[in-house]
């Protein structure tokens, strides 16, 4: 690792995307999907790609000449062409525009700090503001660590957002693979190639408000806090220390300011390592160590995809939209193999919340299995995580008649202090603050693998989601639920849309028990209820009943303590 730190070199893009020389071209074949290949030309410095027979202009370094190039069998063929000043402004941020004399191609010569076809890329931007809609920086890594795909890639031609859109420049898209937020999502994202297909994923781009916090997001590349101790307790050396002469990452690095290095000894991650680190002296020997900087919570954040298929009782969903959803399976004494039992909710790396009534058969813990990251109920997912159960705790005052105190905790089994590993399909939900009171009729979401309707003999083959509204307490009473007991430990939610007997109203159903009812609070999905019971499924003016999580925060914390 120490040798890697000496050898790595981080290069920021400080010049226009078209400043290349023939020796910088890479002739490559790009894998497309899982079957075919397509010959392209790629610029090594800027990652700009060009399809077969595509043409472009480029300035020649240290020269006033401009070349006309085209991509031929993976090789750029170029020759000089006469140019003139553009008849209309086409370059942003003070770029100088030149147009070919005999055809319409143009090239922008960008001032320092900007790049791109139209100088629209801000190479000095290290974080994003608000939702990142105006972010034009050069971050190109997804939260999973996957490298973003160039927006101009032919593999994205059929995607709703690509560099080929007429409004691509306005949206920040183009011949690059940098994170953007063209659809006004919650933060910048990009397309990545995973599991044999291209899909969207949030980027690990830091928010500007995160940079100076006392914790780090992702791998901590954007961490700008003041921690200066390593995991062993050693003090970090200043990045401008004379002892570091000859090292790559010091205050003398040409990109030091952008990398967060300077006349200080604060922990940083300039080379994209797993987490922030620093140089230290141990036994009079210069080495490096990871820092004792805590990771920031990412609970309740997700890569939400709009469901495409409406089915009875809700909508088919992808697990990345509900990464805290767990599937609990059990071995029954009287039947071979495992059977789906209930839903669950990931609230920390090693703990799952569920409903107490799911465990009335008093299964031995080793008969239970918890699966995270699975979209299809019985089909293994490529990124799923599977765990045995160390123990489970059912609330001592659970009433199996009224379902009061319908809550349980499952501890996942692990050889270390961590169990579930965070990814785009596995992430904790936020527990609510004790005083959380959302307005009546707030729209919330539930998810699960339960039945489409009450009389169906089968559970859903795929994860579903449903959209319901929180009922006021005056409508969550016994008289609204056929005189069934309703306690202060319960809350109600249902689909309030109008419609006749055939209306497809959203609701939880058998098999969804133990799953989450989540609502947006302070920009994060927050757990307000655990799916508990109801009268049928999807009946008009009949809400579902959920365990009120705010009543059990102390119980949860007490039982999670070692």
Curated annotation (Swiss-Prot):
PROSITE patterns registered for this protein in UniProt: EGF_1, EGF_2, EGF_3, FN1_1, FN1_2, KRINGLE_1, KRINGLE_2, TRYPSIN_DOM
Regulation of this protein's activity per its record: Inhibited by SERPINA5. Inhibited by SERPINE1.
Protein EC: 3.4.21.68
Disulfide-bond pairs as recorded: 41-71, 69-78, 86-97, 91-108, 110-119, 127-208, 148-190, 179-203, 215-296, 236-278, 267-291, 299-430, 342-358, 350-419, 444-519, 476-492, 509-537
Record keyword DNA repair present: no
Residues of the Peptidase S1 domain: 311-561
Record bears the keyword Repeat: yes
Signal peptide positions on this chain: 1-22
Catalytic activity: Specific cleavage of Arg-|-Val bond in plasminogen to form plasmin
Any GO CC annotation of this UniProt entry: apical part of cell
The protein's name: Tissue-type plasminogen activator
GO-annotated biological processes: blood coagulation; fibrinolysis; negative regulation of fibrinolysis; negative regulation of plasminogen activation; negative regulation of proteolysis; plasminogen activation; platelet-derived growth factor receptor signaling pathway; prevention of polyspermy
A molecular-function term among this protein's GO annotations: phosphoprotein binding
Glycosylation site list: 96, 152, 219, 483
Domain (Kringle) ranges: 127-208, 215-296
Not glycosylated, annotated site positions: 253
Species lineage: Eukaryota, Metazoa, Chordata, Craniata, Vertebrata
EGF-like domain ranges (all copies): 82-120
């Amino acid at each position: 690792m120490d040798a890697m730190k000496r050898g790595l070199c981080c290069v920021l893009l400080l010049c226009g995307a078209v400043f290349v020389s023939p020796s910088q071209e890479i002739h490559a074949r790009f894998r497309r999907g899982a079957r075919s290949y397509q010959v392209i030309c790629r610029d090594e410095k800027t990652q700009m790609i060009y399809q077969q027979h595509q043409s472009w202009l480029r300035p020649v370094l240290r020269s006033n000449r401009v070349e006309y190039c085209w991509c031929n069998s993976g090789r750029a063929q170029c020759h000089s062409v006469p140019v003139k000043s553009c008849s209309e402004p086409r370059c942003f941020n003070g770029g100088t525009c030149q147009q070919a004399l005999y055809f319409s191609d143009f090239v922008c010569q960008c001032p320092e700090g900007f790049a791109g076809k139209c100088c629209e890329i801000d190479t000095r931007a290290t974080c994003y503001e608000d939702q990142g809609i105006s972010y034009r920086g050069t971050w190109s890594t997804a939260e999973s660590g996957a490298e973003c795909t160039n927006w101009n890639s032919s593999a994205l031609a059929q995607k709703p957002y690509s560099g080929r859109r007429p409004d691509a420049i306005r949206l920040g898209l183009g011949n690059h693979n940098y994170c953007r937020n063209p659809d006004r999502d919650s933060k910048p994202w990009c397309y990545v190639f995973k599991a044999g297909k291209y899909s969207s994923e949030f980027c690990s781009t830091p928010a500007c408000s995160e940079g100076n916090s006392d914790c780090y997001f992702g791998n901590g590349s954007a961490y700008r806090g003041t921690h200066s101790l390593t995991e062993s307790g050693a003090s970090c050396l200043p990045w401008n220390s004379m002892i570091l002469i000859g090292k790559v990452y010091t205050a003398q690095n040409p990109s030091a300011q952008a990398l967060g290095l300077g006349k200080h000894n604060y922990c940083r991650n300039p080379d994209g390592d797993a987490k922030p680190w620093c140089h230290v002296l141990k036994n009079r020997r210069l080495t490096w160590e990871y820092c004792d900087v805590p990771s920031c919570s990412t609970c309740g954040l997700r890569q939400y995809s709009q469901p495409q298929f409406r089915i009875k009782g809700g909508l088919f969903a992808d697990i990345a939209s509900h990464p805290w959803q767990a599937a609990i399976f059990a071995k029954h004494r009287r039947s071979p193999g495992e059977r789906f039992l209930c839903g669950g909710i990931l609230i920390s790396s090693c703990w799952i919340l569920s409903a107490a009534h799911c465990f009335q058969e008093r299964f031995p813990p080793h008969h239970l299995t918890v699966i995270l990251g699975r979209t299809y109920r019985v089909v293994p997912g490529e990124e799923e995580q599977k765990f045995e159960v160390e123990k489970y705790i059912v609330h001592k005052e659970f009433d199996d008649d009224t379902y009061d105190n319908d809550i349980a905790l499952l501890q996942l089994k692990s050889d270390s202090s961590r169990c579930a590993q965070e990814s785009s399909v596995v992430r904790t939900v936020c527990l609510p603050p004790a005083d959380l009171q959302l307005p009546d009729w707030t729209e919330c979401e539930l998810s699960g693998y339960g039945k489409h309707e009450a009389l169906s003999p089968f559970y859903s083959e795929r994860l579903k989601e449903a959209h319901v509204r929180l009922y006021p307490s005056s409508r969550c009473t016994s008289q609204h639920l056929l005189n069934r007991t309703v306690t202060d430990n319960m809350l109600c939610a249902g689909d309030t849309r109008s419609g006749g007997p055939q209306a497809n109203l959203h609701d939880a159903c058998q098999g969804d028990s133990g799953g989450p009812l989540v609502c947006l609070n302070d920009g994060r999905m927050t757990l307000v209820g655990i799916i508990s019971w109801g009268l049928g499924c999807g009946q008009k003016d009949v809400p579902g009943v959920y365990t009120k999580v705010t009543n059990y925060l102390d119980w949860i914390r007490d039982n999670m303590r070692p």
